[in-house]
Amino acid sequence: MNKRELILSAAALIALCVPPARAQSTTTSTAPATTPATTPDKPETIAQRKDNQQDRIAQGIQSGQLTPGETKNLETKETDLNKEEHTMRSDDDGHLTSADRAKLNNQQNKLSNNIYDDKHNAAQDHFGNSEVGQRQENQQDRIAQGVKSGQLTAGETAKLENQQQGINKEVSGMRQANGGKLTNADKKVVNQQQNKASKNIYNKKHNARTRQ
């Protein structure tokens, strides 16, 4: 056997020993993408709605968007709603009927609009950097904190803001009577009134009544 024949025989032998390649499936199954289940938002409860309204009022007091007069009016409305809710519960063994909830929700919707309107109108507090102005702003900050924390009820807040509204009107009258300025006697009178208001704020924030 010559060299050429030897090479051809070896190649044929190798071909017989090697098995034919099997076709491999390249198709892969893809699981359909799953969408996480979503839970629809639950409507706010009556208590949550009241808390939300008070938080919005507190923010308005803190920022100066709500004047004492506006806050007094809003909190008076909230007090009336709370009284109405209490009466509803008393009439139904501590529970609220579906009709009660619908009525309260409609009234809270109106109050919500009132809060928005008062916070976005032209009436805002700008107390300035004077000693009297800083005292006025400090009182508002303390009231806002009490509203936010629940230490102050809507009724208590209305009374405190009524007092602040009266002081602010008196300060405005004093300034008008003296070319836009306060005399030393004016400052003394205002400071004494704010001392009384400060005690009222403290007492109402630390009594047994809290927002329910």
Regions found by a protein language model. Give the residues of each.
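Bacterial N-terminal signal peptides that target proteins for export
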Residues: 1-8
